[in-house]
């Protein structure tokens, strides 16, 4: 199973903390956010990861290298110029199989990625989005439902 993790952003909303370290590398306890995500993905059956890097790419390469010490095969897709989620996917698409996970590298969750992936394949869905219903209004990442499983 493969995952494309988007880690190329500048983390501007967290400045000054992200001035010298990208948000996915910020520590939570004794590990970085991205280390926690990689462990969760590995536990869910992911064995190959492509990191879509941009901002401070050298830090990701230096720390994660080929992924061997994390029990994963990690490669890198380099964005010279940030082109958003679609641009990062387009740049890495030749390395990915038909079904793969795309996720942000700064989002911690208890989602079972393996279970979601199996459900996606079982339904032969064109795409599957993991979301969390909130009552608190937010300015970004808003999803509206038509039914329980269909989006507007």
Task: Please state what every model-predicted region is.
Residues 1-19, 42:
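N-terminal nucleotide-binding beta1-loop-alpha1 segment
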Residues 2-5, 27, 31-104, 113-115:
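Conserved N-terminal catalytic core of the sugar/cofactor nucleotidyltransferase
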Residues 8, 54, 132-133:
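Histidine-centered beta-alpha loop that forms part of the nucleotide-sugar donor binding/catalytic region
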Residues 10, 106-107:
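Active-site metal-binding loops of divalent metal-dependent hydrolases
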Residues 15, 23-26:
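Pre-signature/interface helix of ABC/ABC-like ATPase nucleotide-binding domains
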Residues 16, 81, 132-134:
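Short Gly/Pro-enriched turn/cap motifs at secondary-structure boundaries
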Residues 20-23, 72:
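A short helix-loop-beta submotif of the ANL/AMP-binding
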Residues 110-152:
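Conserved core of the sugar-phosphate nucleotidyltransferase
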């Amino acid at each position: 199973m493969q995952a494309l993790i988007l880690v190329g952003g500048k983390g501007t909303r967290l400045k000054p903390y992200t001035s010298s370290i990208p948000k996915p590398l910020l520590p939570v306890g004794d590990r970085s956010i991205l280390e926690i995500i990689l462990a969760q993905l590995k536990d869910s059956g992911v064995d190959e990861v492509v990191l879509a890097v941009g901002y401070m790419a050298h830090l990701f390469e230096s720390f994660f290298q080929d992924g061997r010490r994390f029990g994963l095969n990690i490669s890198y897709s380099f964005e010279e110029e940030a082109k958003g989620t679609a641009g990062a996917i387009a740049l890495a698409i030749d390395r990915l199989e038909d079904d793969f996970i795309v996720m942000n590298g700064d989002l911690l969750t208890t989602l079972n990625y393996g279970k979601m992936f199996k459900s996606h394949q079982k339904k032969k869905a064109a795409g599957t989005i993991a979301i969390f219903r909130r009552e608190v209004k937010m300015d970004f990442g808003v999803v509206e439902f038509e039914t329980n499983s269909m989006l507007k």
